[in-house]
Swiss-Prot record:
Residue sites binding ATP per the record: 24-32, 47
Name of the protein: Serine/threonine-protein kinase PK-1
Organism: Streptomyces toyocaensis
SUPFAM superfamilies, sorted: Penicillin-binding protein 2x (pbp-2x), c-terminal domain, Protein kinase-like (PK-like)
Active-site residue numbers: 141
């Protein structure tokens, strides 16, 4: 069912001006609609805050003030804010409508991007953030969902001002706003934010574009937050072998855990990004990343969230682990006492106190029995993650449990020697039962196979058979390896790596071919010579004037002496003949005057003095008569007597 049809705003006119046509997206703080400004007759995007936030008067006040400030931020890479207002319970922003998609859509469809494409997106994002930083704004919620890519290729940053307004409120409520995958450590630990939190988020953004995955991931937001605080962002080349070192440096500088080590704002990071691009060659910029599907995307992790700042982020516990103290504090048991007996005269009165005592004892006994049946004979498996076998046995004994069978298994997430439990931590189990322990052997490792000389497709298949991923492919000339076959791998053959790692391939372009010089040749002769050298020939449709006769080769690309691969194409541009010019009449002129006229008309000049003209200075004749035409650049001989 189309949920747009159920949205109460669709079809309404907000503030007597904005007609809501369709719902575009729903986020953690607002819903975005496509709307029409009925006064100006233009399509725009209308962002309407969720009622739970719009009901906060202090939020609305700050939001309006911030929105007005951001509306003055004019930059070609910032989504423009046209208007802000309220209509009853609705608080809205009227913004520029961008027909296109988000960076998240691109990553979901394509996975990793080529370095050139990643930098083409990153640089306008940093330009937009740099303008905001210099104007005193911090975005605070940079993520692929807030990078819009128009159908015309323009890159724009959305949601300026919105996150700042919400953060102004959350500073007073002890919370931090943001999307956990892109939060800087200082945002998590102290709730502080300056331009360097945007720099950090852009570093994560670049890593994700280059590798197709996030640097820190986990089963819960708490695990991701812990990794941001305690783990460095790995270099992109660890996920995509062969990635240029300059890109590793760029990501590392932007994602340093200490804010004082990062570039101080987006302008500084933009300068570093442009410097990195300048130091990369075309092969590095256009290197094709592994053709893998984009990683599964969890929308919940990329939704802007309000995170309690008071939360101390500890080493993440297993998903099912519970805090027993908290559980007990919130658990209440209720027992019903039997109804009072009706009075039965004096004997009943005398036996009343005894009956009450017996009744209470019966209730307590019944309650204890119920407790034992339901809870007393059970205990919880204590958390054993990251414990040694001895520590795990001791903790089990303290909980009244025995250690059962101990086995070993590979794990990509649990360190070597650490313990995972079965049943899992927090599970209810009968007292004195045994718990099987699984001891991690660490990640499974494999050796990079010897792929030298294999065709590229076969090499990729062999890597996948070994549990490895094909990495980036670069191409080089080789006199010994046939074109299309593997020259080498990175890491090299025999290297022990983690299963699932990517291996970069260097593929042969074959032996280089020296391009012969065919300028000035007849087309058929030139074609024959190039094809004999193993090259393809393409003839340009446009002809140019040159010193060569019409129909002959005027120029070639690549030029003579260039090194290309067998089968590459050489483009020939044919001559339409030399450019003609009228020859000036210089008979009777002095030598100096004649030379000036002829050279001014585009000709070269040669002098024929003979024996009689050794000391003369007057032109008595010329090789091409005055008024006739001759090719520009040709030589006119003057006779001097």
């Amino acid at each position: 069912m189309d949920t747009t049809l159920q949205d109460p705003l669709v079809g309404q006119v907000l503030d007597g001006r904005y007609r809501v046509d369709a719902r575009i997206a729903v986020g953690g703080m607002a819903t975005v609609y496509r709307a029409v400004d009925t006064r100006l007759d233009r399509v725009l995007a209308l962002k309407v805050m969720h009622p739970s936030l719009a009901a906060d008067a202090s939020f609305v006040e700050r939001f309006i003030r911030e929105a007005k400030s951001v509306a003055r931020l004019a930059h070609p890479n910032v989504v423009q804010v046209f208007d802000q207002g309220t209509d009853g319970a609705y608080v809205y922003l009227a913004m520029e409508y961008i027909a296109g998609c988000t960076l998240r859509d691109v990553l979901r469809e394509r996975g990793a991007l080529q370095p050139r494409a990643a930098l083409d997106i990153l640089e306008p994002v940093l330009a937009a953030l740099g303008a905001a930083h210099r104007a005193g704004f911090v975005h605070r919620d940079m993520k692929p969902e807030n990078v819009l890519i128009g159908d015309d290729g323009r890159v724009k940053v959305a949601d300026f001002g919105l996150v700042r307004a919400v953060d102004s409120v959350t500073n007073t409520t002890g919370t931090v706003l943001g999307t956990v995958s892109y939060l800087a450590p200082e945002q998590i630990e102290h709730g502080t934010a300056d331009p360097r939190v945007d720099v950090y988020a852009c570093g994560i953004l670049l890593y994700e574009m280059l590798t197709g995955e996030k640097p820190h991931d986990g089963d819960s937001p708490a695990i991701v937050l812990y990794k941001h605080l305690h783990d460095d962002v790995p270099p992109p080349s660890a996920a995509v072998p062969g990635m240029a070192y300059e890109l590793d440096e760029l990501v590392a500088s932007a994602t340093a855990r200490g804010p004082e080590v990062r570039p101080h704002d987006a302008v500084a990071l933009l300068a570093r990004a442009r410097d990195a691009r300048a130091r990369l060659g075309d092969e590095q910029l256009d290197a094709v990343p592994p053709q893998a599907l984009a990683s599964e995307h969890d929308n919940a992790d990329d939704r802007t969230s309000v995170i309690p700042r008071a939360l101390t982020v500890r080493r993440p516990l297993p998903v099912n682990e519970e805090d027993e103290g908290a559980d007990a504090a919130h658990r209440t048991s209720r027992f019903r006492s039997p109804p009072p007996l009706p009075p039965r005269g004096r004997t009943a009165l005398r036996r009343g106190p005894m009956a009450i005592v017996i009744g209470v004892l019966l209730v307590l006994g019944l309650g204890a029995g119920v407790w034992y049946i339901n809870s007393g004979q059970f205990t919880k498996v204590p958390p054993l993650l990251a414990k040694t076998e001895k520590e795990a046995r001791d903790r089990l004994a303290d909980a009244g449990l025995d250690a059962g069978q101990v086995s070993e298994a590979y794990s990509d997430t649990v360190e070597r020697g650490s313990v995972a439990t079965d049943p899992e931590a927090g599970a209810r189990i009968r007292t004195n039962d045994s718990v099987s322990l699984t001891l991690s052997k660490g990640p499974r490792t494999v050796r990079v196979p010897d792929l030298d000389g294999y065709p590229q497709d076969k090499a990729r298949s062999l890597l996948e058979d070994e549990g490895l991923k094909p990495g980036m492919s670069t191409r080089e000339f080789s006199d010994s390896v046939p074109a299309g076959s593997v020259i080498s791998t990175e890491p090299g053959k025999g290297t022990e790596v983690r299963a699932g790692s990517a291996v970069a391939l260097t593929v042969s372009k074959g032996a280089p071919v020296d391009v012969p010089d065919v300028a000035g040749d007849d087309l058929e002769d030139a074609r024959a010579e190039l094809e004999e050298a193993g090259l393809e020939v393409k003839v340009a449709t446009e002809r140019v004037t040159s010193e060569y006769d019409a129909g002959r080769v005027a120029r070639q690309d690549p030029g003579p002496g260039g090194r290309v691969a067998e089968g590459d194409t050489v483009t020939l541009t044919l001559s339409k003949g030399p450019e003609m010019a009228e020859v000036p009449d210089v008979v009777g002129d002095s030598v100096g005057e004649a030379r000036e006229k002829l050279e001014g008309a585009g000709f070269r000049v040669d002098e024929d003095r003979g024996l009689l003209g050794l000391f003369g200075d007057t032109v008595k004749g010329q090789s091409v008569d005055g008024g006739d035409s001759a090719p520009k650049g040709s030589t006119i001989t003057i006779e001097i007597r």
